[in-house]
Amino acid sequence: MNKLVLISGSSRGLGAAMAKSFSEAGYKVAINYFNSEKEAKDLSETLSNQSHAFKCDVSNKNEVDIMLENIKEVFGHHPSILINNAMTSYVFNGDDRKNADSISWDEIQNHLNVTLKGSLNLIQGLISDMKSESFGRIINIGTNLVQNPVVPY
């Protein structure tokens, strides 16, 4: 098993915390970001093991394929662990978040494109490499907002 983990949405928050933990455990870390370039590059510089930041919109299959090729170029092999953690910019403040009567389908579709389509794009981009190595781990991170919603009342 190679010790390379790809964490989508890992420039800040939970993703950055996981990147730090994997680095401390001796893993190389491929940090994926979309908007938070400074945070991603700062994180990459602070990790003790080899790491690198890769910009990619995971909802775009072409960008995912390019990122995976770039990861192989930088590290010499594909990741053996994939953590799907990317989410769209989300407002956790119930008072500032759109309500059901004002949110548009396009906004919902954007969330689905990043969380579901993005995960599928990454899985499909890595699954053949994982099969050929007879090893791979895929972890999908969700949200507990359906169980503990942030509501403005």
Regions found by a protein language model. Give the residues of each.
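Conserved glycine-rich cofactor-binding loop
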Residues: L4, S11-R12
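Catalytic loop of short-chain dehydrogenase/reductase
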Residues: T88-F92, D101-E107, H111, R137-Y153
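A glycine-rich helix->loop->beta "capping" turn
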Residues: N70-N84, S104
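The beta1-alpha1 cofactor-binding region of Rossmann-like NAD(H)/NADP(H)-dependent oxidoreductases
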Residues: E37, K55-L68, W105
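Conserved glycine-rich Rossmann-like NAD(P)H-binding loop of the short-chain dehydrogenase/reductase
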Residues: Y27-K41
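Active-site loop of short-chain dehydrogenase/reductase
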Residues: K3, H77-P79, M130-T143
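A short, exposed helix-loop element centered on a Lys and neighboring polar residues
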Residues: I123-Q124
